[in-house]
A protein has these predicted regions:
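Short, Lys/Arg-enriched N-terminal segments with co-localized hydrophobic residues
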Residues: 1-19
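Active-site neighborhood of HAD-like aspartate-dependent phosphohydrolases
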Residues: 17-69
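Short, basic/glycine-rich phosphate-binding loops at helix/coil junctions
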Residues: 62-77, 102-104
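Substrate-recognition element of Asp-dependent hydrolases with the DxDx(T/V) motif
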Residues: 81, 90-122
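Substrate-recognition "cap/lid" segment bordering the active-site pocket of phosphatases
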Residues: 110-154, 160-164
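Asp-based, Mg2+/Mn2+-dependent phosphohydrolase catalytic module
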Residues: 148-149, 160-202
Length: 202
């Protein structure tokens, strides 16, 4: 009985000591934003969805290639933000990390131009889809500075600029790899939330 109790207490102390502030991006990290947005765009513009997906265009390339994109942008993102699907096992892994005493701090570049009210849109979606979080920051251009201010221990994002921004301030950075985003050098890489969980405590 004493051995079991000692093991439990020791394990508890380890978990408490390992508490971290985990910074997490939303689009294409928690959600399948790219795929969902292309589905909406293909319907709006009458384009071949499979062909559009296979081209692996970046967001900037998509914007430049579509007529009147600026006129439709807010509507496109508004529909996407409400209907976007989640990455596999993201809810389970984030809940597990939070249950282990870590703080989940969501940091997104979602802005007022594309989303109207990015905080409201994001908050309602996250709560409605049972995504656990302790803080939510929107319209963040310089994620490196914010991560430093919030004492982030480890950060995950798909975007090249964001990963470089955070990595450059000395914070452990993980890129969530996608087919349409170049890989960042000098950071860790995962392609699933299960992989990220395995990486967190290494």
């Amino acid at each position: 009985m004493r051995i079991s109790l000692f093991f439990f207490v020791s394990y508890y102390i380890v978990i408490i000591g390992d508490r971290m502030n985990i910074g997490v991006d939303i689009d294409d990290t928690i959600t399948n934003t790219y795929e969902t947005l292309l589905t909406i765009i293909s319907m709006k513009y009458g384009l071949n969805h499979k062909k559009l997906i296979s081209m692996n265009l970046g967001y900037d390339e998509i914007e430049k290639s579509l007529d009147n994109y600026d006129l439709y942008k807010k509507d496109l993102f508004s529909v996407m933000a409400k209907s976007v699907t989640l990455k596999e096992n993201v809810v389970e892994i984030l809940n597990k990390l939070r249950d282990e005493g870590n703080k989940i701090i969501l940091i997104t570049a979602r802005n007022y131009e594309e989303y109207g009210d990015p905080y409201k849109v994001s908050y309602e979606y996250l709560v409605g889809n049972n995504i656990p979080f302790d803080k939510l920051f929107v319209d963040v251009y310089d994620k490196g500075s914010l991560c430093k201010k919030e004492n982030i221990d480890i950060f995950i994002d798909d975007n090249v600029r964001n990963c470089n921004s955070v990595n450059n301030v000395g914070i452990r950075t993980v890129q969530f790899d996608t087919s349409f985003t170049p890989k960042v050098k000098d950071v860790e890489h995962v392609s699933s939330w299960d992989e990220f969980y395995e990486l967190v405590y290494k």
